[in-house]
UniProtKB/Swiss-Prot annotation:
<dbReference type="GO" id="GO:0048280">
    <property type="term" value="P:vesicle fusion with Golgi apparatus"/>
</dbReference>
<comment type="subunit">
    <text>Component of a SNARE complex consisting of SED5, GOS1, YKT6 and SFT1.</text>
</comment>
<dbReference type="GO" id="GO:0005789">
    <property type="term" value="C:endoplasmic reticulum membrane"/>
</dbReference>
<dbReference type="GO" id="GO:0006906">
    <property type="term" value="P:vesicle fusion"/>
</dbReference>
<dbReference type="GO" id="GO:0000139">
    <property type="term" value="C:Golgi membrane"/>
</dbReference>
<dbReference type="GO" id="GO:0031201">
    <property type="term" value="C:SNARE complex"/>
</dbReference>
<dbReference type="GO" id="GO:0006891">
    <property type="term" value="P:intra-Golgi vesicle-mediated transport"/>
</dbReference>
<keyword id="KW-0175">Coiled coil</keyword>
<dbReference type="InterPro" id="IPR039899">
    <property type="entry name" value="BET1_SNARE"/>
</dbReference>
<protein>
    <recommendedName>
        <fullName>Protein transport protein SFT1</fullName>
    </recommendedName>
</protein>
<dbReference type="InterPro" id="IPR000727">
    <property type="entry name" value="T_SNARE_dom"/>
</dbReference>
<dbReference type="GO" id="GO:1990674">
    <property type="term" value="C:Golgi cis cisterna membrane"/>
</dbReference>
<feature type="topological domain" description="Lumenal">
    <location>
        <begin position="95"/>
        <end position="97"/>
    </location>
</feature>
<comment type="function">
    <text>Vesicle SNARE required for retrograde transport within the Golgi complex.</text>
</comment>
<keyword id="KW-0653">Protein transport</keyword>
<feature type="transmembrane region" description="Helical; Anchor for type IV membrane protein">
    <location>
        <begin position="75"/>
        <end position="94"/>
    </location>
</feature>
<feature type="domain" description="t-SNARE coiled-coil homology">
    <location>
        <begin position="7"/>
        <end position="69"/>
    </location>
</feature>
Length: 97
């Protein structure tokens, strides 16, 4: 009878050990997936950082060019403003008549 009890206990232990091994394999797979996603997300974040840095540099360069052009051509801006004013006056006159 002790042999039968021993074999039942061994059988129970084997089933529990197999269940634990399956859970451990599942956790290892989950851990691997998390690691893969972290690497992928890190790559995406690095690409976004590079893109934002490039965009910031482009905006800074455009801003400095705009500032230089505004300082250099005051008479051009006056002519553009005068042309717009004349356009709106003529538009309003034609709209009324």
């Amino acid at each position: 009878m002790s042999n039968s009890r021993y074999s039942q206990t061994e059988s129970n232990n084997d089933r529990k050990l197999e269940g634990l091994a399956n859970k451990l394999a599942t956790f290892r797979n989950i851990n691997q997936e998390i690691g893969d996603r972290a690497v992928s997300d890190s790559s995406v974040i690095n690409q976004m950082t590079d893109s934002l840095g490039s965009m910031f540099t482009d905006i800074k360069n455009s801003s400095s060019r705009l500032t230089r052009s505004l300082k250099a051509g005051n008479s051009i801006w006056r002519m553009v403003g005068l042309a717009l004013l004349i356009f709106f006056i003529l538009y309003t006159l034609f709209k009324l008549f």
